[in-house]
Amino acid sequence: MSAEQFVGRWKLVESENFEDYLKEVGVGLLLRKAACAAKPTLEIKVNGNKWHVNQLSTFKNTTLEFTLGVEFDETTPDGRQFKSTITIEDGKVVHVQKRIKDSDHDSVITRWFEGEKLITTLQSGSVISRRAYIRE
C-alpha cells in the first residue's frame, strides 16, 4: 500500500453506526445530530511522512496535520483533546487517540481500501462505526 493512494478528495457515501460511536465518545446530542447529517469531503495530501487532512462539511471544517509515527496533540471538532499517533500497519492507516482527560474515551480510527472505496472504521470500547468514501 502506498500513501499516495490516499491522496485526493473523498466524498462520504455510506455511514453505519456513526451516531452510536459519537455517543460512546461523549459527543452531546445536538452535535451528534449535526455531525450525522453532514456529508463531509476529505482532502488528503501527503509529502513523504507528512500528511495534511482537511475534513470539509456544512457542519464544520477541520484540518489535521501530522507526521507518521510521531505523537501529536489533537483537538477533535467537538473540542475533546487527545495525544494521537498515526501509523501505517498492514496496508491500513491506523489513528490512535489516547485520552488526556479521564472523562474522554480512547478511539482507534482505521482507514483502508476496499476496491475503489476508502473505508474508515471508528472504534471506542465495543462500539464500531463504518464509513465509506469515494474519490471525487
UniProtKB/Swiss-Prot annotation:
Q: What residues bind a fatty acid, as annotated?
A: R111, R131, A132, Y133
What GO cellular component is one of the record's annotations?
Answer: cytosol
One Pfam family cited in the UniProt record for this chain: Lipocalin
Q: Which organism is it from?
A: Caenorhabditis elegans
Please give one Gene Ontology molecular function term for this protein.
fatty acid binding
Which CDD domains does the record associate with it?
Answer: FABP
Keywords tagged on the record: Lipid-binding, Transport
Name the protein family. Answer: Belongs to the calycin superfamily. Fatty-acid binding protein (FABP) family.
Alphabetical list of PROSITE patterns matching this protein: FABP (PS00214)
Gene Ontology annotations of biological process type: fatty acid transport
Q: Where is the signal peptide?
A: none
Q: Among its keywords, does the record have Ribosomal protein?
A: no
Please give the InterPro entries that the UniProt record associates with this protein.
Answer: Calycin, Fatty_acid-bd, ILBP, Lipocln_cytosolic_FA-bd_dom
Question: In its UniProt entry, what is this protein called?
Answer: Fatty acid-binding protein homolog 5
